[in-house]
Amino acid sequence: MGRTETGDESSARKMRRKVPTSIESLDADILCIIFSFLDLFDLVHCTVVCNSWNAVIKRLKLLQASCRKMHHLGSDSPSSSTSLDRPAEIDVEDFAMKHHKMALLRGRIEIERWEAHSHRVSQCRMKKGLLLTGVGDKVMRLWSLKSYKCMEEYSLPDASSLIDFDFDESKKLEVVSLAWEYFDSVVVVVVEIVGLVGTRISIWRRNGQRSIFPSRAGTFPKGLCMRYIDPEAVVGCEDGTARVFDMYSKTCSQIIRTQGGPITCLSLSDNQLFLSGSSLGRVTVSDPLMDQPVATLKSTITAGGIQTICFNQGTNLAFIGTTGGYVSCWDLRKMDRLWEKRVSPNVVYSIQQLRNDTSVMVAGGIDGVLRMIDQKSGRVLSRVIMDDKFSTTSTRNNQVVIEKRRGKRVSQDMEIDKIERKVRPQISCIAMGMKKMVTAHNGKCISVWKFNLS
């Protein structure tokens, strides 16, 4: 006869089943197997999850092995003149940026699209595996870029009330694991989202809870744009003022008069400087410590309003896109224009670059073409559109249907107007990631572009 299990043993077994596995308790051999499937960029992320993961990656020299693997993929891969066997001589960030650039310019392009909203939306923000979409619909939605699962919804009074939104990386809760493909129980939640709703600042917290700034402190003339870096949000207004709000005291701490016309776009820097673009074609550099603007940048070549501003923290260069299709580069240390080029026959809606990338940026606009642009010269290095062939598949939870396409590169002498509009929907917003980007199209669908060398 088989042994009969006692009640105490049965309870103990159930208790063991219910005890969650901590990431700290995973065996080094198991971690090694999991890490062997990750590329260099995911490995770098994993080094900062916890000390035990960092120790395993360093002890087994997994970063060096990944660098060697990428180095030997082919002659087009970024190379290094130093020995890859000596950890101290590997500049992982430099290697990653070179690989990122090569993927954007020469990699195979895979596109995954899904209907993210029931109404048109024009904006998207991406931070480390999370995507926030909205402006145009009655809700903002927070998505996982691994599973395309909608993790949270944030409701609005009405569809037309949300003008702009943002969230800060520092406001993310802990990540249980960054090896997303191998752990299904990952929970990543944005603690705080800041939105410009009508003439008020609103804050959404976990589970969609919304709070509004007090009437006296949070009301201002019509706001046209907003950016947020904890602890401040800056709102660009129709009357040409930029209003700085302290998110902790919920008060307007400063009003800066730019005298450059309605403010249409903003960009904030880590050192508290912010840039504002106007419909009159001026860019104003402001410092919250001063009541007056630091400088005003104005093109002598082009006319038209400023549509987008992208600031490179590492080089102190500002990239500016206009309604006339021009992109210009300004050195904020000298307040001098370095170059100005017309990259598109139509309005440029969005310019983005990776935070640490000093070589390539991406521009998109009304003609629906993604353009990879050299940051140093303004030369268009590559032009990308969608292929017209596609297939569909459902996510594991059947929450969304994914449309899969290939991207294709367009030669510089090809006339864009002769390409069908269905493969180049207008690009209203770009969110940039490592070897990937997300685009909104002022429609119901969101697109994820992935660039791979392998």
From Swiss-Prot:
Chain positions of WD repeats: 85-116, 117-153, 170-214, 215-255, 258-296, 301-340, 343-383, 422-454
Source taxon at top rank: Eukaryota
Keyword Repeat on entry: yes
Residue ranges annotated for the F-box domain, each copy included: 20-66
Name of protein: F-box/WD-40 repeat-containing protein At3g52030
PANTHER family in alphabetical order: F-BOX/WD REPEAT-CONTAINING PROTEIN 2 (PTHR44436), F-BOX_WD REPEAT-CONTAINING PROTEIN 2 (PTHR44436:SF1)
Annotated keywords: Repeat, WD repeat
SMART domains: FBOX, WD40
UniProt keyword Transmembrane helix present: no
InterPro entries recorded: F-box-like_dom_sf, F-box_dom, FBXW2, WD40/YVTN_repeat-like_dom_sf, WD40_repeat_dom_sf, WD40_rpt
